[in-house]
Amino acid sequence: MDFEQNEDINGVRFSWNVFPASRTDANKNVVPVGCLYTPLKEIEELAVVSYNPVVCGGPHCKAVLNPYCEIDVRSNVWACPLCGTRNHLPQHYANMSQEAMPAELNSTTVEYITNRPVQVAPIFFYVVDVTAEEENLQALKDSIITSLSLLPPNALVGLITYGNVVQLHDLSCTAIDKCNVFRGDREYQLQQLVEMLTGEKSGGNLSAGPQMKITPFSLNRFFLPLEHVEFKLTQLLENLRPDQWTIPPGHRPLRATGSALNIATLLLQGCYRHVAARICLFASGPGTVAPGMIVSSELKDPLRSHHDIDSDNAKHHKKACKFYNQLAERAAENGHTIDIFAGCYDQVGMSEMKKLTDSTGGVLLLTDAFSTAIFKQSFIRLFSKDEEGYLTMAFNASMCIKTSADLKLQGLIGHASPVNVDAQNVSDSEIGIGGTSTWKMASLSPHHSYAIFFEIANTAATASLMGDRPKLAYTQFITAYQHASGTNRVRVTTVANQMLPFGNPAIAASFDQEAAAVLMARVAVDKADSDDGADVIRWIDRTLIKLCQKYADYNKGDPRSFRLAPNFSLYPQFIYYLRRSQFLSVFNNSPDETAFYRHIFTREDTTNSLIMIQPTLTSFSMEEEPQPVLLDSVSVKPNTILLLDTFFYILIYHGEQIAQWRKAGYQDDPQYADFKSLLEEPKLEAAELLVDRFPLPRFIDTEAGGSQARFLLSKLNPSDSYQNQSAAGSTIVLTDDVSLQNFMIHLQDVCVNGQN
């Protein structure tokens, strides 16, 4: 079964491609029925049509016409496979024949360009922390100015700068630099803001809106078309200087991040509610002023660690989380995205602010400085364009999932927020964001993937055949979004999965171990946000044992007889590396780093997620062609170069002998051209990996005995540790971690002896 083909055609990948016939049977499978779906996946020869979708008229259905529908050409009627309702086709389908079918009856994924125009161009609201050092601020200014050239000319732009106070810049005033200054230690309400900026009391009913004319006193004067104010905005940015507020010795700068974000979200709510908008926050340190304070301004107060948060010793953590979660709800409800870019060695408070990005589809990027290539290139890649020159980012999206009566939705794990709708196909048990069949994504990109979990609705197994046909469960993903070209679009993907009774060999054969590992990892990461890390790892171990007991072949009490089918055999290995990953093992990571890693993991597709769980290792040598090797200490040899891809960083490691030859300069001698090309080969492959990755990975070039070799050794399975030195020529890893071999021995032992 080619699981990747379904992903290429529809952007969807299921853990089980044949579903159990009943809920009881599904529970026995341990790994839930779920899928990873990429709504805006770049699909070759995607069917794009310029008319509105035809929708089923069944009560509570509203599914879209698709290839699984039964069509009666003579009477111009179609039957919905999800609810069974018979519907009349619109008049323009009258000339349809079996030989000439419209795209939506031939393609399981179709994109509709609707006739509803976009009223307002997207808004880009820059929120800039000016407490940065001059060099860091200069690099940031250069990147923002570059980004202006990548925006559509009709895009609306706005600017806030902040330090101890918050400055809202009035771009409509060309003669002088005019700005409104707000206190950084106050949490303003919308009514106060409207009164201060317009001189009018709103009385709870704002007149400002997308159609309101921009005047010198209107609230929307702070957002103007880029083509009219690019010179003024560039001038303002170029003239920005580091905050002049005096910093007493032993103190951090006063930084009102919370107040700046509060004002930005309120201002957009006041005049552009439900209009596509991005708030881009650039932070050069933690918020030190309430609301949203992460740490006090005194340097004697350290930034919170994981241990502080777990033991309830993080003084400002809960209050800051509550504040930023409220802002996240406001932004998500209004259809506004928040991006957070950190450019400093300190933590900025991503752990507290993560909901701002995770609820709105925004970007969370952790870098050491705004002058680094990681920030510069990642920020510019945010504005990447398609072949037609439009931004690949989409705005104001929502995804509704329709299912046939056999399925119910348990929830979604990904960068979205729930929409309160009354739907019949919602399960009482929740995984991730549940209780709904519709989710809002203020921003979408071709990279965004969502984990969706299903419950089998049938409590008892029903007949698996309907006459001569197999029983099928239908799922339809309907994603409505605003395209950067100024059109409203709807992408519809419809899939069908066969349902069979438990024990049927087709169910086991349909198991996609890669998708299953990523889905279970998403559940584990979601649990880890609220549960104790050790409990989450115990839960993962239990599910692995139960799955192996169910699907492995073995004789009771004989570990040597333990066998897994090829499509199950790698699953324990994925779980082993997941247990050791930075997503669950947070030791040695700051809360901000953990938030960043988990944010990236919960947005990527199956392939990239697997690289994060189990990094890839490629070996280069003079004797052999480049080849993938085991992520194991036995792969580290003196005469090879290793290329490690963890998604977050790409590392080239030179073995001891290679490093000595490189130091001796053999590559500069024409006699050793082969050695020179060997050194270049991994660099060329690394460059290919860097081409379209977001965010840009860190690049590390190291060698045996080098200080940065630890980045490789920490990822390797310690086959050869100081406790067990076996293979000659391999590297000893100094760790107390259990090796994959011992992990598998223990797993086999537990399974064959019937333990849990």
From Swiss-Prot:
Keywords: Cytoplasm, Cytoplasmic vesicle, Endoplasmic reticulum, ER-Golgi transport, Golgi apparatus, Membrane, Metal-binding, Protein transport, Transport, Zinc. InterPro entries: ADF-H/Gelsolin-like_dom_sf (IPR029006), Gelsolin-like_dom (IPR007123), Gelsolin-like_dom_sf (IPR036180), Sec23 (IPR037364), Sec23/24_helical_dom (IPR006900), Sec23/24_helical_dom_sf (IPR036175), Sec23/24_trunk_dom (IPR006896), Sec23_24_beta_S (IPR012990). It is a peripheral membrane protein. This is Protein transport protein SEC23. One of its GO terms (molecular function) is zinc ion binding. GO terms for cellular component: COPII vesicle coat; endoplasmic reticulum exit site; endoplasmic reticulum membrane; Golgi membrane. One of its GO terms (biological process) is COPII-coated vesicle cargo loading. Belongs to the SEC23/SEC24 family. SEC23 subfamily. It comes from Eremothecium gossypii (strain ATCC 10895 / CBS 109.51 / FGSC 9923 / NRRL Y-1056). It comes from the Eukaryota. Component of the coat protein complex II (COPII) which promotes the formation of transport vesicles from the endoplasmic reticulum (ER). The coat has two main functions, the physical deformation of the endoplasmic reticulum membrane into vesicles and the selection of cargo molecules. The COPII coat is composed of at least 5 proteins: the SEC23/24 complex, the SEC13/31 complex, and the protein SAR1. Zn(2+) binds at C56, C61, C80, C83. The gene is SEC23. Gene3D superfamilies: beta-sandwich domain of Sec23/24, Sec23/Sec24 helical domain, Severin, von Willebrand factor, type A domain, Zn-finger domain of Sec23/24.
